[in-house]
């Protein structure tokens, strides 16, 4: 008599595997939001963000949380990385103003073209938050984030002159 070993592992389809992981991450997010203490929403000082990926994530999150206006000045590649969030912002009825170096089309947004020789990026959200920095150095890129009104006003003037 031969005993056959039972199969202990059978790969699931990739789509099912991904759905399981996304579902688990969503559950973990909800648990963290329930369990972690709430934090103050306002940032009184200045925060330095390091790394291109982290900077892009902060830009995207700021756009998603905006309630009225977004002003962004960046190279075409940076604007392209933000396309989904900018499109969604226009869809929510936000005023979206983009200053970039190459032709870029986004229905409902106001777009200006200016010479953008470097990888500087500037974003103002709701006249309350500002992000400014450089994306040229990959993981060594840095960005300054603040909700200090004097810095927001300074960058509003700077964007008017671009």
Tell me the role of every PLM-derived stretch.
Residues 7, 68, 120-121:
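Generic beta-strand structural signal
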Residues 1-2, 114:
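Short beta-strand
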Residues 15-88:
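PLD-like (HKD) phosphodiesterase/transphosphatidyltransferase domain
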Residues 2-12:
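Minor-groove-contacting beta-hairpin "wing" of winged helix-turn-helix DNA-binding domains
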Residues 78-162:
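C-terminal regulatory/effector modules of DNA-binding transcriptional regulators
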